[in-house]
Amino acid sequence: MAVIQQLDDALSNKIAAGEVVERPASIVKELVENAIDANSSQILVEIEEGGLSSIRIVDNGTGIEPNELELAFSRHATSKIKTDRDLFTICTLGFRGEALPSIASVSRVNMQTSTGSAGMQVELEGGKIVHKQPSEARKGTTIVVTDLFYNTPARLKYLKTVLTEAGHVSEVMNRMALAYPHIRFHYVSDGKTVLKTAGNGDLRQVIAQVYGRKTAEKMVPITGSSLDYELRGYIAKPELTRANRQYMSIFINGRYIRNFKLAKAIQQGFHTKLPIGRFPIAVLKLEMDPTLIDVNVHPAKLEVRLSKEEALSEMIAESIKKALSEETLIPEPKKENTAKTKSEQLSFSLAYELQPEKEHVRETMQQPRQLAADDQVDRKKESTSIGNSWSPSHQQEEEVEQGRGSNASIPPRNERVETNTEEKYEQADRRTDESLPMEMEEEAAVVEPQLPLGNDAEAKGAMPPLYPVGQMHGTYIVAQNEQGMYLIDQHAAQERIKYEHFHQKLAEPLGQTQELLVPITLELTTRETLVVTESKEKLEAVGVFLEEFGKNTFVVRSHPTWFPQGDEESTIREMVEQLLDNKRISIGELREEAAIMMSCKAAIKANRHLRTDEMFQLLETLRRCQEPYTCPHGRPVVIHFSTYELEKMFKRVM
């Protein structure tokens, strides 16, 4: 008997199914991709018991010719490619010809399809055709998959609960809807509609369906292009983050992919705007020449190889930075959720079945503007239509405050409110560039060397002028302008100022140094000594020059004049620890970490009471920062309470 044997098709398909058909969500993904490749404009997906019992997919695509239906369930039979050249210019989602035979080998399948002239129906069990007959000529395909893994019980026992499997299917459908907003998707689980999109091509509307209306409202459009790539999509403002990367969706030529470097590029675009351990929400759609991407890496087609990956990552990061720089990123306080009424649900035009007249609500005043002569604030703004229904996963986020009816009557602002705030601070404005008294410099200087204020300082995205009126608990500055009240975290504010100051100094060639009367002596461990010896050039690039002074001992005889005073030794030690944690850290990354660390040490601390002119100087310097809205660790610097919200809190408007 021969030792090496040719496996039969049934066994080969089961082996292939181990990679292609992981769980019910894998089947939904493959079959929906087939429907998309068939130029469908409407796709219905119905599952029962998380897809374990039944999966039904109906589309209105081109269908399959009756005489080719049986061939479609053969291994490596496909209409997508014909030659080797086609393999490197793939423009479809499917191309391997493995999905249908793999699915059929581990389940019972019933498919009915037609190109519009004649229809055919076929039934399979365990990959074998058991029945075949003509059917109606409705153009499109209906496929029903039941009893998944009925003939491979070992695979069945490794599946999770019904709710978990249904969640995976929902994730697949959400990605498909985001990738193809021009297709009308209808996803039903156990008889309940989970997702239903309009298919009108409005990506923001689909985001509202998937992530919720409030999330969609905080999404910022993004565009970018180069000779090889075209980028468009939406990113959430930094105030809206998640605990993992699952909310970053990257699509290349309509295909959802996972790529660590591109995900990292998204995070780099939010540089210092995200809190540690938090991740942004992003929906990015990339278009490129198919020759620049290799999708033939894994049967699941989630992993791809990219040409010019570094250039693409840089373009993504820069496009995100540009989009965020054009937005006002001052977060507003979170509103309490209250019970919503049916009329309030309908007042926001999320429905595409029901399109009510656009209501006028108050203008969200985030940009500086002059008040009218009669001192009234126009708070009307057309609400944006961005979706219709919501899934159970985010239904709780859809709460709307009671009392906000359409066309609410908003009285003029009380005359006692000071309107010309700038007059009060004319003298303080003239003192902006003056230094603080010496005793304050010793304690924790509030004022930094003035950062250059760009020509676009008053453009969209720039921080508006703020006028301090007091301080709370020696920690928060209370300020105002025509748009309302602001709370500023004074430590975070100066941390941002110091960070940009140190970051600028670290990037410059080493300038003046300060000789120390008493050199700093560092006693290190053997491991630390080895790391310092290997990374001496990196330390010198950030202004730290170490001389050997015996076994495992180094001395520092000078340091740059801009080093944080009084914290020189601890600063140098922390730089050594960073090298110890990451020996491969680049000079740029070390400069970045050093700037963050030094800014935190040098910034003014809480419980530090400031005079009004000191607060004014701090706020003016903050305005000159390139990124004034977050500290280097991503925490917010400023919280905005609009005049409308304050009046609403005091029941002056309803």
UniProtKB/Swiss-Prot annotation:
Entry keyword set: DNA damage, DNA repair
Give the source's domain of life in one word: Bacteria
Q: Where is this region: Disordered?
A: 358-437
Pfam families membership: DNA_mis_repair (PF01119), HATPase_c_3 (PF13589), MutL_C (PF08676)
Q: Where is the composition biased (Polar residues)?
A: 384-394
User: A single Gene Ontology molecular function, please?
Assistant: ATP hydrolysis activity
Identify the InterPro entries for this entry.
DNA_mismatch_repair_CS, DNA_mismatch_repair_MutL, DNA_mismatch_S5_2-like, HATPase_C_sf, MutL/Mlh/PMS, MutL/Mlh/Pms-like, MutL_C, MutL_C_dimsub
**Which residue ranges does UniProt annotate as crossing the membrane?**
none
Please note every region of biased composition (Basic and acidic residues): 413-434
UniProt GO cellular component terms? mismatch repair complex
Q: Which GO terms of type biological process are on file?
A: mismatch repair
Q: Does the keyword Iron-sulfur apply?
A: no
Asked whether the UniProt record includes Magnesium among its keywords, one would answer: no
Into which family does the record put it?
Belongs to the DNA mismatch repair MutL/HexB family.
What the protein does? Answer: This protein is involved in the repair of mismatches in DNA. It is required for dam-dependent methyl-directed DNA mismatch repair. May act as a 'molecular matchmaker', a protein that promotes the formation of a stable complex between two or more DNA-binding proteins in an ATP-dependent manner without itself being part of a final effector complex.
Q: Write down the HAMAP family for this protein, in alphabetical order.
A: DNA_mis_repair
Q: Which PANTHER family is this protein grouped with?
A: DNA MISMATCH REPAIR PROTEIN MLH, PMS, MUTL, DNA MISMATCH REPAIR PROTEIN MLH1
Q: What is this protein called?
A: DNA mismatch repair protein MutL
The organism is Shouchella clausii (strain KSM-K16) (Alkalihalobacillus clausii)
